[in-house]
Regions:
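Ribosome large-subunit tunnel/peptidyl-transferase-proximal elements
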Residues: 1-138, 170-172, 178-191
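Gly/Ser/Thr-rich helix-start
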Residues: 8, 12, 147-148, 161
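Short connector loops at helix/strand junctions that flank enzyme active sites
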Residues: 115, 144-146, 163
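Conserved short secondary-structure elements within globular domains
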Residues: 131-153
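C-terminal edge-of-domain segments
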Residues: 149-172
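Intrinsically disordered, low-complexity acidic/polar segments
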Residues: 160, 177-178
Length: 191
């Protein structure tokens, strides 16, 4: 019986599984980065990866957790902007700001945002993916409470082992747009 056994083994030991999940989470974040046309491994569709259904179901909570941490961290970083300075680093004005009480308030207001970045980095171990998450993905989801991703099962199984494939993608970018039918216009007879 499988009572209280959470998660799928996926034919791997725990360290291999943890590395697999971290790599897949960073892969979906990195599909959103700026790419050039000459880059050999540019994603076909940003914000989407194709994997097996079981792997997609396992990494989805991890992706959602990272985005939630990033959204909360962005809110804290925005609160620190009122205490920041525009002076150039190393200048006399900057040194005065650095020694003042305002700097302490800025550092205290900014620290939860930095902690959020460190927590996400501890989960996925990819600095570039963390930057993409905080700079381009999390700002899109600031008004959304959760459910940042969707899993769509693909009809064709994987060649070789007949594994069920699925798409894991971010919600809101490739949504279907339903067109409303236009109401017919009737001419009103003048009497």
């Amino acid at each position: 019986m499988r009572h209280r056994r959470k998660g799928r083994v996926l034919g791997r030991n725990s360290s291999h599984r943890k590395a697999l999940f971290a790599n897949m989470v960073s892969a979906i974040f990195l599909t959103e980065r700026e790419t050039t046309e000459l880059e050999p491994n540019a994603p076909k569709v940003p914000g989407r990866i194709i994997t097996t259904l079981e792997k997609a179901k396992e990494i989805r909570p991890m992706v959602e957790k990272c985005i939630t941490i990033a959204v909360k961290g962005l809110a804290k970083e925005a609160g620190a902007a009122e205490f920041a300075t525009t002076a150039e680093r190393g200048s006399k004005e900057w040194k005065e700001w650095r020694k003042s009480d305002i700097w302490r308030k800025w550092a205290d207001a900014r620290s939860p945002g930095i902690t959020a970045r460190r927590r996400v980095y501890a989960m996925i171990r990819d600095k570039q993916a963390v930057e993409v998450l905080f700079n381009s993905i999390a700002p899109r989801f600031t008004t959304r409470e959760g459910g940042y991703t969707r899993i769509m099962r693909l009809a064709k199984p994987r060649l070789g082992d007949n594994g069920t494939r699925a798409i894991l993608e971010f919600v809101g970018k490739n949504d279907r747009v339903t067109k409303k039918a236009t109401k017919p216009a009737f001419e009103v007879a003048a009497t």
